[in-house]
């Protein structure tokens, strides 16, 4: 991380990590954010060349063209006319020590152990493997991972995997946090003058339970975070921008890329667009500024094009651009006409949705996905309360008011859309900024008033309470991140901890103290293999490289995969990557394509096309009976046949998963 020291504490915006529109210069991450943005844009551009698939040559041409487009767009979005002239560049050792080193240390705590997180096994991995080479649904496929969101972020991780390896690819999460941290620093510098304290505040703001839980995993939830924070910063400073038209295009492009990376960011994009429109109205009234029509068209293109190709592709396939969601509006014949939602998470009624931003802290298991052993310290809820408070206070800075309004608007949209905390990282960052602002405000009041002033006592009490509360939240979040675990499924469901490390020995005592259960068992012997697993770093780009001749022989007869249960499509893509995958599985308990007569007709036709070829499914041993019963939920035209025990290495010779290779027998006509 290379930084430039500020000569003053003036606000400055950051676009692709560069200082912009500020003659004082600013401290920001320069090359890192450009690399991340280039990776995002290149992968999105690659979607527009999905037609070039079917061979190494076409794929190389497609990626070359995408890279050229990516470089051109990033060059345009970066600041090419910075009028600041710093005396020189130097490394900010304080930033490295307080922010970078702790985040890297946290990442390296689990890094050697390959992450086999459920969503990755279920659809992210297989979607990435296909989308990197062409259409995400190949000839002979039917939704191989069951769910197909925009694969752009999966492609980003896929590129990182082929560059760095499977274990180090999640370093992208650390990069996103460092970029976000550099932007947070710019928000804080107007009211936290001391660099060391400001950097510590940045670390505290970044340390939330959902962020620390996924920083080591190939999850894509953090990719859009710096883009959203950048957009907010640019919107707030739009009246002072040197080139407002160009800034407007940047904002729209960042929001468009955010939507392409994560559909759930729409709950933040809508409030940010509303704030942008308000700012444009204020500027037009006060400064008589009106964007040029050509630049408005470019801004619209930046907002729409990153997702347009994929939405059009899904509409062509299914009749619903957001398939399978919002099907009560689009009525795709491939699934029931309903708006599907996670039934065990988030608010359960419209009334509960209204107060979910406050009450959800009392039921953390409904805030988190796929677990009943979570706790939450309430950063988001505190932020909502403080946002209301600062709007009622006198002399609150305009920027803080705008942050507060954005937080309140987006938090209620989030509650109505899902209410799941992993989709609220941007809101948690804004909550952290408000926490630091309120603390600095109370501290200044407490130290500036005369000793006999009654307000001094009140503010001193407020400082003490805020100190205790923020210390508790940071400590709880940090401990959550250190002791959190994902289940591994080596021999049976949740038979151990996926990425074991020494702090996991304290997981069970911590959960017992909170009267919460723990599913997995901590194995110190597996944790002790840290350096053995670390030896595979930079050598784990290709999963097939870990398969022995015996492993390959287990799957040599597979011509077609039938995905019959959640969480196995990645194993299929590793075991026999060239075989098409036809999914007939339910997606958890959320939606089921097979309830549609049209889907059953399509799937039966595809299976009949492969009649005479060997078809198989892969299952975790614990899931065999559930999968067999699930096949009987509707008539599908096939049943389970011969069952064989197999073992598959997953990015590690020692990290094997025991599976059942089940032959699929097509029913007689």
Regions found by a protein language model. Give the residues of each.
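Membrane-lumen/periplasm interface segments of specific transmembrane helices
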Residues: 278, 293-365
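Hydrophobic/aromatic-rich transmembrane helices and adjacent perimembrane loops
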Residues: 124, 129, 221-227, 258-261, ...
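Extracytoplasmic catalytic/substrate-binding loops of multi-pass membrane glycan-assembly enzymes
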Residues: 113-127, 133-156, 163-168, 317-325, ...
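Membrane-interface alpha helices of multi-pass inner-membrane proteins
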Residues: 50, 247-263, 269-274, 305, ...
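Membrane-embedded, lumen/periplasm-facing catalytic core of multi-pass transferases
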Residues: 124, 468-582
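Transmembrane-helix signature of polytopic, membrane-embedded enzymes
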Residues: 33-34, 167-168, 184-209, 225-226, ...
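Hydrophobic, aromatic-rich transmembrane alpha-helices
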Residues: 3, 19, 177-189, 359-398
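Membrane-embedded, hydrophobic transmembrane alpha-helices
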Residues: 1-90, 630
